[in-house]
């Protein structure tokens, strides 16, 4: 695939802690239900999976937020559960219930059936990456992503989202051997999956460890971070003549920042409970940081959003040898007012230009 030269590489340079003229911004779940145009496309597709498994629809919704806002990166429209779906677990999105699996992994016989899926069964994802890259035409970089081995395992064992993680923690404490086997398979599958996204044209990749923060200290390192590190160590890090940065985001992982930063990633994503300046001192600018505005700030109105954006940028401090990508501390809420996102993007770009110039 012939690719257009990148017109805006500020996001990639910030991830690599290179000098940039301003702080780049993108938002987790930026292509999503808060946008009326997304809901219209989803209605045409008929279902979430109808949207995610059709490269043209996936491309359409990936580009929608960029038509509204001058964001500095696009992120592939997909779901972290495509990999276990390809393992045969039967992913379904019930209206109002979120994702669930028809065949959760609960015992030894279930684990014995698991295998790294043939990446050809996920071709629709890689086709979407190629389509999006073509349509972006070098405007901004494209981010690929996957769930961390632990986070995917939570859904695989629980069968759906959970409030207490009782089923997977029962396995963790009662049959850790089974859980390690699941995590080994997940790590291998995720490595292949992300490398295939990179081969298709993803210019950066992100691992979402959405549920790492539910683990006790010591167990996080053993059951989450160790397998995240396996994935990161096996990724293609050079493509199209430049480095492919890797972002690792553990929601609730503030106490483990130093250890996450040492896993081989280029950037660590932060949730909103962590002070950016403190986090920066703790990782000593060894990696870039991404985050970390509370998503609920968007419900406070334009003035509050602009003030909190400035506060977040000030918290990071003088850029110097550090790297900062502005984002929310978690995915944007489906109820967020789209017009306030415009205020956020404008404030980050305008205010940070002055900071970088000084």
Curated annotation (Swiss-Prot):
PROSITE patterns found in the cross-reference section: UROD_1, UROD_2
For this protein, what is the EC number?
A: 4.1.1.37
Instruction: Provide the binding site for substrate.
Output: 29-33, 48, 79, 155, 210, 330
Site feature location: Transition state stabilizer: 79
Keywords from UniProt, A to Z, are: Cytoplasm, Decarboxylase, Lyase, Porphyrin biosynthesis
Q: Give the location in the cell.
A: Cytoplasm
Can the keyword Cytoplasm be found in this entry's annotation?
A: yes
Q: Record's InterPro entries? A: UROD/MetE-like_sf, Uroporphyrinogen_deCO2ase_HemE, Uroporphyrinogen_deCOase
Any one annotated GO CC term: cytosol
Give the UniProt record's GO annotations in the biological process aspect.
protoporphyrinogen IX biosynthetic process from glutamate
Record's family? Answer: Belongs to the uroporphyrinogen decarboxylase family.
From the Swiss-Prot or TrEMBL record, give the protein name: Uroporphyrinogen decarboxylase
What organism is this sequence from?
Bordetella bronchiseptica (strain ATCC BAA-588 / NCTC 13252 / RB50) (Alcaligenes bronchisepticus)
**Taxonomic lineage of the native organism:** Bacteria, Pseudomonadati, Pseudomonadota, Betaproteobacteria, Burkholderiales
């Amino acid at each position: 695939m012939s690719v257009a030269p990148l017109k805006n590489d500020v996001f990639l340079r910030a991830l690599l802690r290179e000098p940039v003229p301003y702080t780049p911004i993108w938002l987790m779940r930026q292509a999503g239900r808060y946008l009326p145009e997304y809901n219209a496309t989803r209605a045409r597709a008929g279902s979430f999976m109808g949207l995610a498994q059709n490269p043209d629809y996936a491309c359409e919704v990936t580009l929608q937020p960029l038509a509204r806002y001058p964001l500095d990166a696009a992120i592939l429209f997909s779901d972290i559960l495509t990999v276990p779906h390809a393992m045969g677990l039967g992913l379904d999105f019930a209206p109002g219930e979120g994702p669930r699996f028809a065949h959760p992994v609960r015992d030894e016989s279930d684990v014995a059936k698991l295998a790294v899926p043939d990446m050809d069964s996920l071709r629709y994802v890689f086709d979407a990456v190629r389509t999006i890259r073509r349509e972006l035409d070098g405007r901004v970089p494209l981010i690929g992503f996957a769930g961390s081995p632990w986070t995917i395992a939570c859904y695989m064992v629980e069968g759906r989202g959970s409030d207490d993680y009782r089923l997977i923690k029962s396995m963790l404490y009662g049959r850790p051997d089974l859980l390690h086997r699941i995590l080994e398979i997940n790590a291998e599958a995720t490595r292949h999956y992300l490398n295939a996204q990179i081969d298709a044209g993803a210019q950066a990749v992100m691992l979402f460890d959405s549920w790492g923060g539910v683990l006790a200290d010591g167990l996080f390192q053993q059951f989450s971070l160790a397998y995240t590190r396996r994935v990161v160590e096996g990724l293609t890090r050079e493509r199209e003549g430049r480095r492919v940065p890797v972002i690792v985001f553990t929601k609730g992982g503030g106490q483990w920042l130093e250890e996450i930063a040492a896993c081989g990633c280029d950037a660590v994503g932060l949730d909103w409970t962590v002070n950016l300046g403190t986090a920066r001192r703790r990782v000593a600018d060894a990696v870039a940081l991404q985050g970390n505005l509370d998503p609920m700030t968007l419900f406070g109105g334009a003035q509050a959003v602009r003030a909190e954006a400035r506060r977040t940028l000030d918290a990071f401090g003088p850029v110097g040898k550090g790297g900062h990508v502005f984002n929310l501390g978690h995915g944007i809420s489906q109820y967020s007012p789209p017009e306030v996102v415009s205020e956020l993007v404008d404030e980050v770009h305008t205010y940070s230009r002055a900071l970088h110039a000084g």
